[in-house]
Design a protein with these regions (language model features):
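Surface-exposed, charge/polar-rich loops and edge strands
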Residues: 1-242
Length: 242
């Protein structure tokens, strides 16, 4: 793919890909190739910022979600039901899942990518509650799974323990599967308590996720950003939503 094509950059940058994008359109902690886009909230975290976080005794974990082309796919349908999410690859270490479980109520996700990954873990744990020997394909979180009442009865602690037990039974040190989760108004967050995120474009699933998290207060937040000349999108300003 590297030989046949070029790094895809957001279409709203209105320019061709440049060689420098291979370094600048990337987080400093990226390790695994696979995403079609950088998780742009992470672009704010320089080595110096990460060192300062560590010095404050703030724990951090790394996880993998290969961002799909659907990230740039605008919501064109009249209702959310008409929008189809793409499948995205997920990989999370067992040690990370255990640490998340031990720190529930304190989890801050860097970027909507991390939010989708972390919230998907809950529903994978729900699947394992009824199907302890589920295959990787059976663990894939379907788009509308979170909105079915029967899929929301476990605590986050119980769901994550199901994953840990599953990994132990399979003598695996990481969970590898995928998700098609859509997070939109009405969604109940199970794991994430805060989000570090940029300001997103209209008619995007990313803005739907933010609206779900701040329970409809996104208009006030975005109005403030516009009035104070905040920069939007990939190379824009960041925010901490709690």
């Amino acid at each position: 793919l590297d030989a046949a094509g070029v790094l895809p950059i957001p279409p709203y940058l209105n320019r061709e890909t440049e060689k420098s994008d291979l370094q600048t359109y990337q987080t400093v902690y990226s390790k695994i190739k696979g995403s079609v886009a950088a998780p742009t909230a992470g672009l704010h975290f320089t080595p110096e910022v990460l060192a300062a976080i560590d010095a404050q005794g703030i724990g951090r974990e790394e996880l993998t979600l290969h961002v799909g082309a659907g990230t740039f796919k605008p919501v064109k349908s009249e209702t959310i039901e008409g929008h189809e999410m793409h499948t995205e690859f997920i990989s999370v270490r067992r040690s990370s899942i255990e640490r998340i479980k031990n720190n529930l109520g304190k989890i801050i996700a860097v970027g909507t990518t991390s939010v989708r990954t972390l919230e998907s873990l809950y529903y994978m744990g729900v699947t394992l509650a009824s199907n302890p020997d589920a295959t990787a394909d059976e663990l894939i979180v379907k788009q509308w799974m979170p909105y079915e009442e029967t899929n929301n009865r476990l605590t986050a602690d119980e769901a994550l323990q199901n994953i840990l037990d599953y990994l132990d039974r399979h003598q695996a040190d990481k969970l590898v599967t995928a998700t098609r989760i859509i997070i939109a108004p009405g969604y109940e967050f199970k794991i994430v308590c805060g989000i570090v995120t940029n300001f997103h474009q209209p008619k995007s699933t990313l803005l739907l996720l933010i609206s779900a998290f701040v329970k409809g207060d996104w208009k006030n937040i975005y109005d403030y950003a516009l009035r104070h000349d905040f920069r939007f999108l990939s190379y824009g300003d960041s925010s901490l939503l709690l």
